[in-house]
Amino acid sequence: MLAGQDKSVNDSAVKVKWGYKGDIVPERWGKLTPAFALCATGKMQSPIDITQKIQIVPHGLSWQYQSAPMIIMDNGDTPLNLDGHQMIINEGHGVQLNFKDSPPREMITFLGNPYRLVEFHFHSPSENRWHGQSFPMEMHFVHQGKAGKVAVIGVFVKAGEANPAIQQIVENLPKVEGRPFTIKGKRINPADLMPHGKAYYHFKGSLTTPPCSEGLQWVVMADAITASPAQIALLRKAMGGDNARAVQPLNHRQISFSAEEN
């Protein structure tokens, strides 16, 4: 965020503040309100540390992303239908890009099911880890499916060459919180923010922010994309610094790995 890290979610018409600093840090989310109880008691929480390939499965991911108008906002809300429950999620991510649902062109197909891209946002440092390794940043692409299904694609971002698609974003960072801005004459294609390799890890998980609802399909791409240190620094500044939840216990979940399609 531009002006700090406090966030809020509607809880019975009461704004419940949560964040990443002070007495409302992730470790305390589950105690802030009963609506956030899963943050403390859930058994399928995200993020996780991807430490092993438990099961190798056939590849089941494809995307049909297309260029779309650039709608960017800071500290915005995301409407989701999760297992039949309509909810408005403020993910505490600071910078997000929204995608309109008509026409539903920004799509993926995962395990035979279609999902529509709702928004993508940034976390820094990365929330998911790979064999204990953290990355400077991670992008989450949030997709809505039928019958209350939600799928999130996580893409690690490492420091390296400047990223032209991310440059579009840093050049148009909003200066006012909570309002979507359509950048006139600018379009963005989410496919430009995906790695060239299509291998991925898959596991069941949750929202990484309150209310930490479970039942999400998580896909984390095996390859990272790059952004320049300057691009990462500008996005971190816009987000107000760190906005990452610590990794959560895997418990009895399986992690599957799918190699790139031939």
Where are these regions (language model features)?
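Alpha-carbonic anhydrase
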Residues: 1-262
